[in-house]
Amino acid sequence: MTPSAATAAKARTSFDVQRVRRDFPILAERIHGKPLVYLDSANTSQKPQAVLDAMDDYYRHANANIHRATHLLSERATALYEGARGKAAAFINAPDPHTIVLTKGTTEGINLVAQSYGRSVLREGDEVLISWLEHHSNIVPWQLVCEQTGARLRVAPINDAGEVDLDAFDALLSPRTRIVAVGHVSNALGTVNPIARIIEHAHAAGAVVLVDGAQAVPHFAIDVQSLGCDFYVFSSHKMFGPTGVGVLYGRASLLEAMPPYQGGGDMIASVTFEKTSYNVVPYKFEAGTPNIGGVVGFGAAIDYLSGIDRAAALEHEDDVLAYATARVSEIPIVRIIGTARQKTGVLSFLLEGVHPHDAGTILDREGVAVRTGQHCAQPIMDRFGITATIRASLAIYNTREEIDVLVRALERVRGVFA
């Protein structure tokens, strides 16, 4: 047995995927009379029963506003909400729960940094550096703040495998580079960026670094202190939690210096018509009544992931991805988009002569859920001279047997368009 085969065999025996699958009620659904094969977790992940139960229990036994009352229900809700903040800090090894800002998701976290930090420090002639791999949420906020400040947006190119050209990235760093904003993992291609190296080189140039971790957090453990990043953002719904909740981790000194992003209740210390003073970090960034039930569910999702052997889960996912890549590549009309040496969770491809949307419709009739389109990453499509791809994206609950179903469904697509 080769080392790679031995590793794959170990992954299949040390990680009990069938036990994990039983934790997710929706995986028992039938779609058009066929068992659901859910291969769209990069879009949004499914939710374990523990998350559903936690949210149900909150609404039944603790539903109240937080930080605003002394009655028991409010105290329960506040404890659950702040407990989730503490869990999030521990989950990414943040130094203190007060470095965790709870947001609506990754998109809001990036916009918050762009408008609160970026708009405060950027001046005409300054530069923000991103890469061609970015999700629109890590492009457009920087375009907006560059338009507002006169700063310039620079973009590091990628090679034909879908990897950032690190020499070109380094060449774009200069004393004018104030902010570097990069994805940890590409949502469209699955490329895992050498993020520690990128952070090190950006810091050497004097830049502050934001990492979009939306596609990384579901797959492997994150340690923001070890990485040394200044900001790290991610979403609950990508990691088995509810929608409408996310995290912005920020270096404490930066968060303290940043002005509020929005005004409203709970982000204030005192208000008069003449002057308002603001609450302490992180509360000055959390205006208004938050998605309390969602945050409670997010806390339960962290508990769920923390109870799993993350290393064994990643080995399992890598095995399924390698199997999927090999099996799908056997189909004569397939073209794989994104062949980086380091990938996780995503297989993006085309079927020659078949529009991805047509393929997606037929796959759905076979019970297979994939995403087709630009994946909120139009520049990547432009880079490869295409308009869209079929994207199969994986999570801890996917299996080799589901990949076999995908391949049979793709053969049916091929037959329809032959």
Over which residues does each language-model region extend?
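Pyridoxal 5′-phosphate
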Residues: 1-418
